Amino acid sequence: MKERISQVIVVEGRDDTVNLKRYFDVETYETRGSAINDQDIERIQRLHQRHGVIVFTDPDFNGERIRRMIMTAIPTVQHAFLKRDEAVPKSKTKGRSLGIEHASYEDLKTALAQVTEQFEHESQFDISRSDLIRLGFLAGADSRKRREYLGETLRIGYSNGKQLLKRLELFGVTLAEVEEAMKSYE
């Protein structure tokens, strides 16, 4: 028997839905790629009010764009993230795009078990720009790799140098959590 997920999961396309339904008893809302509009936002808002919504978009530029648009309009939605290597096609005949449709059951289950939501208590946020510089996220030859590693480890997605502080604040990540996550960075 498939595990039931009570929230509606927002995905980009039909193949994402097919893969999720292969393993879970779940309802999805498809944005049809990056072509999200005001009607989509209104529908997602209604779904969120009735069932709750998990945004589970591809770990690429368009997926992050869709996620930001939804997060701006509906800050209380939840988020699930796949690591980039979990979204790579397993077969060369499937193309080179990243997507939820390529993820294994274990990777999907892990991502959905670690759903996060936007953090609303900014006063408790304890990370500064100087902390990010000290930890090598904003300056240095491997700063991009460090940010990628952090985003994957904390399952908050990739952020560029300008967005990292805001992303950490949105998800209520503490300095201690960042330092702990980076202990295993090699």
From Swiss-Prot:
This protein's GO cellular component annotations are:
cytoplasm
Q: Where does Mg(2+) 1 bind?
A: 12, 58
Required cofactors, per record? Mg(2+)
Key word Magnesium present: yes
Bridged cysteine pairs (disulfide): none
NCBIfam families listed in its UniProt record: 5S_RNA_mat_M5
Keyword ATP-binding carried by entry: no
Residues bound to Mg(2+) 2? 58, 60
- Annotated protein name in UniProt: Ribonuclease M5
Give every Toprim domain span: 6-89
EC number(s) on file: 3.1.26.8
Catalysed reaction, written as an equation: Endonucleolytic cleavage of RNA, removing 21 and 42 nucleotides, respectively, from the 5'- and 3'-termini of a 5S-rRNA precursor
Q: Per its database record, what is this protein's job?
A: Required for correct processing of both the 5' and 3' ends of 5S rRNA precursor. Cleaves both sides of a double-stranded region yielding mature 5S rRNA in one step.
InterPro entries, per database record: RNase_M5, RNase_M5_C, TOPRIM_dom, TOPRIM_RNase_M5-like
Spell out the HAMAP family in the cross-references.
RNase_M5
To which protein family does this belong?
A: Belongs to the ribonuclease M5 family.
Subcellular location per the Swiss-Prot or TrEMBL entry: Cytoplasm
Record keywords, A-Z: Cytoplasm, Endonuclease, Hydrolase, Magnesium, Metal-binding, Nuclease, Ribosome biogenesis, RNA-binding, rRNA processing, rRNA-binding
- Cofactor binding, note field: Binds two Mg(2+) per subunit.
SUPFAM superfamilies found in the cross-reference section: Toprim domain
Species of provenance: Streptococcus pneumoniae (strain ATCC BAA-255 / R6)
Q: Which GO terms label this protein's molecular function in UniProt?
A: metal ion binding; ribonuclease M5 activity; rRNA binding
